[in-house]
Regions:
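Conserved phosphate- and dinucleotide-binding cores of soluble alpha/beta proteins
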Residues: 1-139
Length: 140
């Protein structure tokens, strides 16, 4: 990661003032699940032994002008983390605009998931199978 001209970093306490004040253009989070319409679940899987604490993710998810996520497409069980509807508690509703994965990049729209690009060699049908049959809009 390289800080570009105009970029900034600061203490986490100051970050909440920046976030809540609407001064953050883009936030990048790591999710457990993301819905095709941009719902974000990134703080709790619902397991009984987990200590639930949403932390500042909810502030980021709704306070940034754009929320992007970066993740592996598949979870450790081989299932897509991009889902029709999140099964885990939500961090934000309809807040994710872009999904960057190890295999493809997507945009979340009101109509559903839009494919932006894939890694070289990954076919559309193979990607659809990995997504578990989730409808996929193609870029114009």
């Amino acid at each position: 990661v390289t800080l570009l001209p105009g970029g900034a970093f600061f203490h986490h306490a100051d970050s909440f003032a920046m976030i809540r004040g609407g001064h953050v253009d883009i936030c990048v989070l790591g999710p457990f699940q993301v819905s095709a319409t941009g719902d974000l679940a990134n703080w709790h899987t619902g397991t009984a032994d987990a200590i639930p604490a949403v932390g500042g993710a909810m502030d980021l998810a709704v306070g940034a002008k754009q929320t992007w996520v970066m993740m592996d497409l598949l979870n450790k069980n081989g299932k897509s983390k991009i889902v029709e509807k999140c099964e885990y508690p939500l961090t934000g509703i309809g807040c994710v605009k872009r999904i960057y994965t190890d295999l493809a990049t997507f945009e979340c729209t009101a109509r559903g998931l839009k494919l932006v690009e894939t890694v070289q060699g990954l076919g559309l049908e193979e990607l659809r199978a990995l997504l578990g049959g989730l409808p996929l809009l193609q870029s114009e």
